A protein has these predicted regions:
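Bacterial N-terminal signal peptides that target proteins for export
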Residues: 1-10
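Bacterial N-terminal signal peptides
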Residues: 9-19
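Processing junctions and N-termini across compartments
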Residues: 19, 32, 39, 171-173
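Sec/Tat signal peptide C-region and signal peptidase I cleavage site
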Residues: 20-26
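N-terminal Sec/ER secretory leader and immediately downstream segment
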Residues: 26-109
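Mature extracellular/secreted ectodomains of secretory-pathway proteins
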Residues: 73-196
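Extended, charged low-complexity segments
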Residues: 172-229
Length: 229
């Protein structure tokens, strides 16, 4: 599939995102964004050059637009309107098997500081559950202001989590194709619906806990999606 054909597929998925509002099938529904320190909308030539060298860090962000989480003895905890961000560092490139590829993973969780204590605990549980192996070794949890938005009609998104995380994305355009063989090469790190690859206008982690900080502007390294858990 050529890069232009791949963008046609992106356009079809975009129409699905816009025309299909969040269904009532799941308990928790909302929007999702991620970025990695390697390209995900790419072809084999770029991916092979980066494997083992880049893509060992990622930012995963969820905004729960509606729904509640079963928290056992605490009962159902309403998470509507709240966000949570998980930032991870891996020993290997987050490639075809995503978070199952690396031998080791360490993560930091940022929870919405508008949440009460029960909601913060539920947000941490949510992130640990839906980040898979990346939710196993959590080295730091901070409550920060989180502003997350994703325009499903234009596919422009933004996440600002305290001073630690900034992520701004847009959909891929024909001029972003370099080798004319681009596709959504690596799948998203989380289970999501109707995902679309995009360009990271700004992707930055400036927090503590992972022993590294990074900035990856202008890379084809992001995904935008909805979720229904």
């Amino acid at each position: 599939m050529s890069g232009k054909q791949s963008l046609l597929v992106v356009a079809v998925v975009l129409s699905l995102l816009v025309s299909a509002p969040l269904a009532a099938a799941g308990t928790l529904q909302g929007i999702y964004m991620e970025t990695r320190t390697c390209q995900v909308y790419t072809g084999p030539c770029f991916a092979n050059a980066e494997i083992g060298l880049a893509g060992k860090e990622a930012i995963m962000a969820w905004k729960i637009q509606r729904g509640s989480m079963d928290c056992g003895e605490q009962g159902e905890v309403d998470l509507s309107g709240l966000s949570v961000v998980l930032v991870l560092r891996a020993s290997e490139t987050l490639a075809f098997r995503g978070i199952d590829d690396p031998r080791t993973l360490r993560s930091v969780i940022l929870v919405d500081n508008r949440a009460n204590l029960a909601q913060r605990e539920a947000l941490v549980r949510f992130a640990r559950t839906h980040a898979g192996r990346a939710g196993k070794d959590i080295v730091r949890i901070d409550a920060v202001s989180i502003d997350m938005k994703l325009d499903l009609s234009t596919l422009r998104g933004e996440v600002v989590a305290g001073t630690q995380v900034t992520l701004k994305t847009r959909k891929a355009r024909p001029e972003d194709c370099i080798c004319s063989n681009e596709s959504a090469y690596y799948p998203p790190l989380a289970r999501v619906e109707n995902f679309v690859p995009g360009v990271t206008i700004e992707g930055r982690f400036n927090g503590r806990g992972l022993g590294t900080r990074w900035s990856t502007p202008g890379e084809r390294s992001s995904y935008m999606a909805t979720f229904d858990y």
